[in-house]
Amino acid sequence: MRQIFLFIFSSSLLFAGCGSSNSGKSKEVIVFHAGSLSVPMKQVVEEYEKMHPGTKILLESAGSLVCARKITELKKPCDIIASSDYFVINELLIPEYTKWSIRFATNEIVIAGNEKSKYIDELNSESWMDILQKNDVIYARADPNSDPCGYRTIFTLMLAEKFYNKTGLAEKMVSKNQEYIRPKEVDLVALLESNTIDYMFQYKSVAIQHGLKYIELPKEMNLSDPSNNDIYKSVSLDVAGNKPGVKMKVTGDYINYSITVLDEAPQKAEAINFLEFLLGPEGMNIFKINGQEPIIPFSTEEPDLIPSKLLKYLKEPK
């Protein structure tokens, strides 16, 4: 009898333990996102998880092009991808991996430094070209093959060359300090904070989030103004495509961040719920506080394919 009792008792514990483990398991939503979204994304996730204790949002940052290649080349599981350039999702992921994307925020290219940067008191929207070309000044930029901030930096230099009529400016700047190119724009912040570099081309939102000194550039070159889009589209660059050895052409454009849920998302329903919160007033207020301007109403090229929960954000607010 004692043996039978022990067997029944231990079996009961085993099944009780299994039931407890399954019921307590969180839903995990995987988000690949641009490095420049790290700060607002973390804050949005903190708020969402307070309201949904049974859901865990797993954030993984990288350059947007790298985020896309994790899906197309490495076949890594992912629910949501948020890119700093809508072009990345449209060109590399639609239609094979997702059918739609929503453009939800903008930004602008600035030149950022700190109080220890050489000639910081002389830096302005006219002098920056001469200062950054000085032999004793080191500047850094993101990799154009990994991060849209990288090719946008080169676009800004090309547009500055035209705007200021400085023949050869872009080529000189691109060839300078190449050892300080990094995979994503937020990697540049560590170089500045350690005083390894003096300046960097950066998104305004990242400069604000890290309390950096920065100068704004004319709208004809900072990629922030849709009314100047014809000017922006006058420059282009070939960058690494979705397969090794393949190049794709990227054309200058007004900065548009975009986001989507993948067709094969492991937690598609919960991913859409999270996206509903992120794109809602509370989520967008967090972005705005962090210097990331929402584009309201949001836009899409695939209105008929957008999940029904998100359609309300594509209309003009009343």
Question: Where are the regions that the model predicts?
Answer:
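Positively charged n-region of N-terminal signal peptides that target proteins for export
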Residues: 1-4
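Bacterial N-terminal signal peptides
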Residues: 6-14
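Residues that line or immediately flank small-molecule/substrate-binding pockets and catalytic motifs
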Residues: 8, 85, 204
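Exported/periplasmic ABC-transporter solute-binding proteins
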Residues: 18-52, 56-60, 65, 72, ...
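Short beta-strand-centered segments that line the small-molecule binding cleft or hinge
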Residues: 74, 78-85, 89-103
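Acidic, polar low-complexity intrinsically disordered regions
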Residues: 104-108
